[in-house]
Regions:
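N-terminal DNA-binding module of tyrosine recombinases/phage integrases
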Residues: 2-39
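A generic short-segment signal for beta-strand/edge and adjacent turn/coil regions
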Residues: 17, 44-46
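N-terminal core-binding DNA-recognition domain of tyrosine recombinases/integrases
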Residues: 30-44, 54-127
Length: 127
């Protein structure tokens, strides 16, 4: 399971990154968060995006999906998992209750979409 990790830099400032279930740095996410730091993401934005992307990365790990091979239905499954919890439960409610507020789900999706926009632009500039 990926997690957002607070990091204290040499100059004493605090920032956030994402580590995977093997405690390794998630390089594509770190590149995006570093870009955010360079364009002056506020510290709370960096933290919120790191937490959101850690949830996304955990979802990808559980589903065995590579971050650069996602399909549209993967985003739908992620949104559903955020709203209603685990999808693999043998017990299904007829009317599941949301586990996160709409604004939190929207924040998570905003972070994920921003991450993919960054990746698309970054790849364009390299090619």
């Amino acid at each position: 399971m990926a997690t957002a990790q607070r990091v204290t830099l040499n100059d004493g400032t605090t920032t956030w990154t994402v580590i995977d279930r093997s405690f390794g740095l998630v390089e594509p996410v770190e590149a995006y968060l570093e870009y955010g730091r360079q364009i002056d993401f506020r510290p709370n934005t960096t933290r919120a995006y790191a937490q959101s992307l850690a949830q996304w990365w955990s979802f990808l790990e559980v589903t065995g999906t590579s971050w650069d091979a996602v399909k549209l239905h993967d985003f739908g499954d992620f949104i559903s998992a955020l709203r209603y919890g685990e999808q693999d439960s043998p017990i299904r409610e007829l009317r599941p209750r949301p586990t996160l507020s709409d604004s939190t789900v929207n924040l998570r999706m905003r972070a994920v979409m921003s991450f993919y926009r960054y990746q698309a632009e970054d790849r364009k500039s390299v090619v």
